[in-house]
Amino acid sequence: RNEVTGKNTNSELTLFAITDVNDRNIVNVNLLTHLEYERVVYLVTQKKMKVKAAKKQAQKEVFGLLGIDATDFSNSEDLNIAGASDEDGALLAFSLMFQGDRSVADLTALLQAVANDMEKDGTWDDEDTRMSIAEWAADADSAGRLTAIRNNVKSWGLSNSVTKYEKYVRSFWYSEYGLGDC
């Protein structure tokens, strides 16, 4: 489903994840796990890091793309956009900002471009795209769309409430606009 519109999409979005499935029954594959994927592969194969350490570093870097401090967060594959935790709210904010008003094809292209950009150094250097995401977030916030998005996710019936995600959306666009903490 599309978090922004609340509707099912007509196209498939293929996402990847790397996780240890030995001690788990559920893996939530999401935009974070997808963006971590190439970075984790690079850190493990080229920098000879252990998978667990590579995943932790990649998760911190991916959340850092939008200025979110994920130091104490659970693994990305444990997060759920319908969950109740603060970190679940960060996932929801991250997902909807990347989704924006993009088609599945445009979202796929964006995700691939970001994953390719950050694969070797963990950074995303495309300032124009960062600003376009910030502009979408600012417009959505000022137009009251964040409330509509909350209602979309709640209407799916996956949980009784939707965790607060708006602070992450606002923090990102405030930062990109040079407003600091408002």
Feature names for model-found ranges:
Residues 1-182:
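Feature for extracytoplasmic/surface-facing segments of secreted or surface-associated proteins
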